[in-house]
Amino acid sequence: WMMIVEQKCRVIVMLAKCFEAGKKKCQKYWPDSEETKTFGRVKVFNADEVKYCGFLRRRFHIESFDENDVCGRVFQYQYINWPDHSVPNTTSNLVRMHKYVIQCLEEIGGDAPMVV
C-alpha cells in the first residue's frame, strides 16, 4: 500500500485469484468488504465490492499516517476467469473489464497511474 500512496496510484488491475485448485496463488493484500485494516503507515477501508461477469471491482479509501501523503479513493479490478495453467475460454469478460478500467481512469483523471 505504501507504493500505491507514494506513486499516487488510483487503479489496481489484478489478473490472478488468491487461490486456484486449492493452491495459494496470491497474497490477499486488502481487507474484506466494509472493513478497515492497517498496513504499516497506511489505513485501508474496503468501501464496497461489486461482482461483474468475470471480474470484481473493489473501492477502497486509503489514509496515510504521514500528513504529506496524498490519499483517497483507489479502485481494484480483479479478473477472476483466468485459469491457472491455460487461457480463458473467451476474451469478452477481459475486454469488458478493460473498458471499465478505462472509464474509471477517465472519471478520476486520465493521468492516474496503474499497478498491474
UniProtKB/Swiss-Prot annotation:
Class of the enzyme per the UniProt entry, highest EC level: hydrolase
Domain Tyrosine-protein phosphatase: 1-116
Matches recorded under Pfam families: Y_phosphatase
UniProt-listed InterPro entries: Prot-tyrosine_phosphatase-like (IPR029021), Protein-Tyr_Phosphatase (IPR050348), PTP_cat (IPR000242)
Enzyme Commission identifier(s): 3.1.3.48
Transmembrane region(s): none
Classification via PROSITE patterns: TYR_PHOSPHATASE_PTP
Keywords: Hydrolase, Protein phosphatase
Any one GO MF annotation of this record: protein tyrosine phosphatase activity
Residues engaged in binding substrate: D84
Catalytic activity: O-phospho-L-tyrosyl-[protein] + H2O = L-tyrosyl-[protein] + phosphate
Keyword Nucleotide-binding: no
Protein family: Belongs to the protein-tyrosine phosphatase family.
PANTHER family: PROTEIN-TYROSINE-PHOSPHATASE, RECEPTOR-TYPE TYROSINE-PROTEIN PHOSPHATASE
Name of the featured protein: Tyrosine-protein phosphatase 20
Record lineage: Eukaryota, Metazoa, Chordata, Tunicata, Ascidiacea
Gene name for this UniProt entry: STY-20
